[in-house]
Regions:
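Sequence-level motif detector for i,i+2 pairs with an aromatic at +2
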Residues: 5-7, 18, 95, 104, ...
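Rieske [2Fe-2S] iron-sulfur-binding domain
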Residues: 9-135
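Hydrophobic, proline/glycine-rich low-complexity stretches
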Residues: 1-6, 22, 335
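A short, aromatic/hydrophobic, helix- or strand-capping loop or linear motif
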Residues: 2, 12, 58, 161-170
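C-terminal catalytic domain of Rieske-type non-heme iron oxygenases
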Residues: 39, 115-344
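A generic short-segment signal for beta-strand/edge and adjacent turn/coil regions
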Residues: 1-2, 10-14, 34-36, 65-71, ...
């Protein structure tokens, strides 16, 4: 169950060069390469003759030559050469092409109707080019888990109390009530935890001493993009609608879930903070801590995937699942509408 008319993060732009890179997204095999001018191309990774992957062929200029009989395809998927029958290119010799663009250091691919691929629909990342904000390098994980279990996890601030004891946990993460807010693009689960010590991950990063007011803002947007915002401010200064004070510390974790298949997901992430823009040591420290936490998530989620697929007994929901259930219903409705439109 995938939403296709959406931009998905394929990977870091820096990882796609003048080579043929085989990928699988939403169960579809794709080959990605760059034209000589650097612009990205994404094509169906199967020659229409005998379905040899085009990624097994050669990149020649701005075209791909199949490694079996030399059928050659341009960036739009049109066959432009058939060496075994010069001057007689088969009319049906073409492959599907996918819109692809670079933005925010990521390569984005549109998996649905190419006519609907508006670049303005790419998920916006605020302050990306602001020199006063610091940014980690981030990373890429592949998790043997359906992307929706990961989305559930990223709408669940409470799990940090048990899964991330040494990093994102802290007083109040286990029992302070959660709020749920519906947005045009998804769901936010949030809460302010007041007058408590900062979590271990942030204790050395905040710019003040003593207890804090802490915001956990877990936002999930279609098709599967999470914006997790952590705000730390001196105790007594935080809360809904409160103006930031000079000591307010903000870190935003951007998480992009791109389904490979129904049981495997590519997880791309980086962090953006409102302090220490040039401090490489802090960036590395934060990157390593986040990577460790995401490995902890992977260990749990891969077992959840196996357990939910194998065990025929009934699974229950808890109150903390309200946001995840709301997001799933929202996404299912969009997928149903998309399917109905495609069949009309």
């Amino acid at each position: 169950m995938f939403l296709r008319n959406a931009w998905y993060a394929a990977g870091w732009s820096r990882d796609y060069e003048r080579t043929l890179t085989a990928e699988t997204f939403l169960g579809e095999e794709i080959v990605i390469f760059r034209r000589e001018d650097g612009s990205p191309v994404a094509l169906q990774d199967a020659c229409p003759h005998r379905k040899l992957p085009l990624s097994f062929g050669q990149l020649k200029g701005d075209t791909v030559e199949c490694g079996y009989h030399g059928l050659t395809f341009d960036g739009g998927g049109r066959c432009v050469a058939a060496p075994t029958q010069p001057g007689s290119i088969p009319r049906r010799a073409r492959v599907k092409s996918y819109p692809a663009i670079d933005r925010y250091g990521l390569l984005w691919i549109w998996m649905g109707d190419p006519e609907a691929a508006d670049p303005d629909l790419v998920f916006p990342i605020e302050n990306f080019d602001d020199p006063s904000w610091g940014r980690t390098d981030g990373g890429v994980l592949e998790i043997d888990c359906n992307y929706l279990w990961i989305c559930d996890n990223l709408l669940d601030p409470s799990h940090v109390a048990w899964v991330h004891v040494g990093s994102f946990a802290g007083s109040g993460t286990d029992d302070v009530p959660l709020e749920v807010t519906r947005t045009e693009r998804g769901v936010i689960v949030w809460r302010w935890i007041r007058g408590r010590p900062p979590s271990p991950y942030y204790a050395e990063l905040v710019k003040f001493d003593g207890p804090c007011d802490r915001l956990q803002h877990y936002e999930m947007c279609v098709p599967g993009i999470a914006l997790n915002k952590s705000v730390y401010t001196p105790a007594g200064t935080g809360g809904p609608g409160a103006a930031p004070v000079p000591e307010t510390y903000v870190n935003i974790s951007y998480n992009f879930m791109t389904p490979i298949s129904a049981e495997r997901t590519r997880y791309i992430w980086f962090q953006h903070r409102n302090t220490d823009p040039q401090d490489a040591t802090i960036s590395q420290q934060m990157n390593e801590g986040a990577r460790q936490a995401f490995e902890e998530d992977r260990a749990v989620l891969e077992r959840v995937q196996r357990g939910m697929a194998r065990d025929g007994s009934e699974a229950i929901d808890l109150g903390l699942d309200a946001g995840a259930k709301l997001f799933r219903r929202h996404l299912e409705r969009l997928i149903d509408e998309e399917s109905a439109g495609a069949g009309a």
